[in-house]
Amino acid sequence: MASSKQNGPTTASGKSELRSPKPTSENRDESELLTVPDGWKEPAFSKEDNPRGLLEESSFATLFPKYREAYLKECWPLVQKALNEHHINATLDLIEGSMTVCTTKKTFDPYIIIRARDLIKLLARSVSFEQAIRILQDDVACDIIKIGSLVRNKERFVKRRQRLIGPKGSTLKALELLTNCYIMVQGNTVSAIGPFSGLKEVRKVVLDTMKNIHPIYNIKTLMIKRELAKDSELRSQSWERFLPQFKHKNVNKRKEPKKKTVKKEYTPFPPPQPESQIDKELASGEYFLKASQKKRQKMEAIKAKQAEALSKRQEERNKAFIPPKEKPVHLKKPKEASTETKIDVAALKEKVKKAKNKKLGALTAEEVKLKMEADEKKKKKK
């Protein structure tokens, strides 16, 4: 009996020794912990996980603008139908312009009320029902980015917001394809729906665009990251060497003034007191003159100014009678006849003599010979 008792624990311990030790978090590689396996999906929360339901009732309400009233009224039955599947009540108040969602006694998922709250927020921010209803899925999240307070100047804000959208929405479409998110720009907010990794990139791009960084730089970086993620060897390595480094150029657009004022050196002493009219007269000696003498000096100064102005005016008038300077005429020298183009005088004289002897319309000697030969040939043929 004793031997059997001793053998019992030994066999159990032997089995434990044969088993492979369980891998602890310390033994695992850090990269394996951080990477999510492909195709992994979080298990859905079912009624079996919380059979007794919730203890208290929770509710959320949000306001919506006037222009969304017609659309919400039209699609509200679909919203109620989708939320009733998760045992959430939804009410639309058109008088106050608000939407309310609240839990019931049958609600078993504690987080579904947060997703219902995000649903009505997205509907209020002009997101369509088809896209907003995706928020009720477990692997989908949303982010509403407020951009209204990031730029003070209204014109600058509109320009940067349009830069985010791009010509015919091309920039926004490229961002949606790279991040796998649906993005809606409306007013002072940017609404995004998609996976968590994509929402993080969307927020970064939107905030950088509002900080005057063009979205094309971030889109180029995202394209490179997407290609690098396909390589399994590069997943655990740093990607800094592959990503482009853009230099920010801060161009000063401030126009420099034409007249630059140079600041005077600081002195602790006050500036000297300016001279008054009496001080100036005392310095020049006019203060001691009589009134008649002062008047005479004043008249002389006026006459001198008038004479100077008259002489200037006369000079300007005389300018019209001064002829303009003519350009010097350069006479061209006759070109000397070249030796190649010299005329043969003797041959020319002979030609003139022949022309004088010749009658008008008469044939030349050569032409006469040719004619005679032609006549002889005709006679022979006959």
UniProtKB/Swiss-Prot annotation:
InterPro entries: KH_dom (IPR004087), KH_dom_type_1_sf (IPR036612), KRR1-like_KH1 (IPR041174), KRR1-like_KH1_euk (IPR048550), KRR1-like_KH2 (IPR048548), KRR1-like_KH2_euk (IPR048549), rRNA_assembly_KRR1 (IPR024166). Pfam families: KH_KRR1_1st (PF17903), KH_KRR1_2nd (PF21800). There is a cross-link at residues 342, 371 (Glycyl lysine isopeptide (Lys-Gly) (interchain with G-Cter in SUMO2)). It comes from the Eukaryota. Residues 250-262 have a biased composition (Basic residues). One of its GO terms (molecular function) is RNA binding. One of its GO terms (cellular component) is nucleolus. Residues 154-206 form the KH domain. It is found in: Nucleus, Nucleolus. The modification Phosphoserine is found at residue 3. Its main location: nucleus. Residues 16-31, 39-51 have a biased composition (Basic and acidic residues). The modification N-acetylalanine is found at residue 2. Residues 1-51, 250-278, 307-338 are annotated as: Disordered. Part of the small subunit (SSU) processome, composed of more than 70 proteins and the RNA chaperone small nucleolar RNA (snoRNA) U3. Part of the small subunit (SSU) processome, first precursor of the small eukaryotic ribosomal subunit. During the assembly of the SSU processome in the nucleolus, many ribosome biogenesis factors, an RNA chaperone and ribosomal proteins associate with the nascent pre-rRNA and work in concert to generate RNA folding, modifications, rearrangements and cleavage as well as targeted degradation of pre-ribosomal RNA by the RNA exosome. Belongs to the KRR1 family. This is KRR1 small subunit processome component homolog.
